[in-house]
Amino acid sequence: DIANAVWQIAEGLGDTSHWDFTRLMAIREANEAQIAEGADDDRFPVYPQRLVADIRRVLPSEGIVALDNGIYKIWFARNYKAHKPNTVLLDNALATMGAGLPSAMAAHLVYPDRPVISVCGDGGFMMNCGDGGFG
């Protein structure tokens, strides 16, 4: 159980009040600033950071994003701020193309009152579009 493992690690660390996170916080702030730069970029075709920011703006905190595989998954993994646990679905280990749409469909079945969006490319969509009557 991860909670137990984290608890044991924390117990083993002892006093951490002397730790200095100044440099780490500066790196985080620089990263946040870089992400914010692209959030309102109006270039065409759409800038990936803009797409991620727009989806974050319109999707409520309990909304679910199901990602297929493609370079956009990296943009979401780096730039999308999940406000609640289990609201970003991605298959990181095997990079399974075509998983985004069925993941979104399953999420909607499990959480019918929450908005769900699938982000997938043409190939991933075509692999499963018949499952939802889209084909």
Which residues make up each language-model segment?
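Hydrophobic, well-ordered secondary-structure segments
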Residues: A10, L101, M105, I117-V119, ...
